[in-house]
Amino acid sequence: MARSVSSFKFLGASVFDALYVSISRRGYSGAPPAAVTASFGRPGAMGKVERRYAMKESSSSETRAYSSAWAPDPVTGYYRPENCGAEIDAADLREMMLNHRVRSQ
């Protein structure tokens, strides 16, 4: 009898845990959009819009040239963004920004 009560407690606890997990679990999908569209309706069937979109994607990716946003710096050799301007020393920047006009009295 004691054995059946302990197994009932274990079974009840495991059912409660499974129910709690299923309620508190968030449903994020890991499937790519093509797999989702292909899963509805006939297996492997794609509509005209999806087929046209897939053809545009494949043709544009083949014609597109590869470019990276990072390029090696000619001075240091380290990689830095391509669109980054040249660095200016603080003293040079201060000299450019300060107005050196002498006021005549």
UniProtKB/Swiss-Prot annotation:
Any one biological process term the GO annotation gives: response to stress
Coiled-coil segments: none
Domain of life of the source: Eukaryota
Record carries keyword Transcription regulation: no
The keyword Transmembrane helix appears for this protein: no
Induction: By water stress; in leaves.
Protein family (similarity comment): Belongs to the LEA type 3 family.
Name of the featured protein: Late embryogenesis abundant protein Lea5-A
Organism field: Gossypium hirsutum (Upland cotton)
Chain's gene name: LEA5-A
